[in-house]
From Swiss-Prot:
Domain of life: Bacteria
GO biological process: rRNA catabolic process; rRNA processing; tRNA processing
Function: Phosphorolytic 3'-5' exoribonuclease that plays an important role in tRNA 3'-end maturation. Removes nucleotide residues following the 3'-CCA terminus of tRNAs; can also add nucleotides to the ends of RNA molecules by using nucleoside diphosphates as substrates, but this may not be physiologically important. Probably plays a role in initiation of 16S rRNA degradation (leading to ribosome degradation) during starvation.
CDD domains per UniProt: RNase_PH_bact
Organism: Gloeothece citriformis (strain PCC 7424) (Cyanothece sp. (strain PCC 7424))
Binding site for phosphate: R87, G125, T126, R127
Assigned EC number: 2.7.7.56
Listed name of the protein: Ribonuclease PH
GO molecular function: 3'-5'-RNA exonuclease activity; tRNA binding; tRNA nucleotidyltransferase activity
Reaction(s) this enzyme catalyzes, per UniProt: tRNA(n+1) + phosphate = tRNA(n) + a ribonucleoside 5'-diphosphate
Keywords, sorted A to Z: Nucleotidyltransferase, RNA-binding, rRNA processing, Transferase, tRNA processing, tRNA-binding
Keyword tRNA processing annotated: yes
Amino acid sequence: MPWTRPDSRQPDQLRPILFETNYSRFRVGSVLAHCGETRVLCTATIQPNVPKFLLNSGKGWLTAEYRMLPGATPERQSRELMQLSGRTQEIQRLIGRSLRACLDFERLGERTIIIDTDVLQADAGTRTTAITGGYIALGLAIKKLLEVGELQESPLKLPVAAVSVGLIEGEPFLDLNYAEDTAAEVDFNVVMTGNLDLIEVQGTAESGSFSRLQLNQLLDLAQTGIQELLVAQQNAINSTYQ
């Protein structure tokens, strides 16, 4: 029997998205990213220094952190204090890699940008929402530096966005929620640039296997969703006054 989406979306339809920019008064760039019932607070902090391996290089750096609040899921999760889980480390490395791909570090100069992504509510897709929202926080931070004259030209090369896709009952679906994520035989996280080049493809079969044709279908579906997200990102950045 064909899979019926719990929220009645079409297979190629994103969940409702909303970007509340300037969410934090203390950060140079911030956004509360809504993706369906998933909520991720993304903030950008700029520090006037770089890691030791970049000292006197004239180049900047970007790093990212990811955390999930204890109350973000139906059952409370313990805070990660002294040691991060393997999952958390993997996700924040993914976010950092994805956002570094969009920066010209020579234009940024010797500054470090820290992107903090905190999951307030999780209904699947937290890492992809963190990347998509993280780019908005980054874009707002760069916009501010340009406005105040700390940068003469933007170090942003291309926007970056991410989305999940999966196979359920052998059929491809875009932007899985939690119920769909747990039912999927195959699920992928796909990260792309504004010119639709791939930055990262994370995917696995939870049961069985999948064909090259199905892989191509999933990537095409991800591209469709990412094109929509890229437009929404740019609208959020352009319409924000700091």
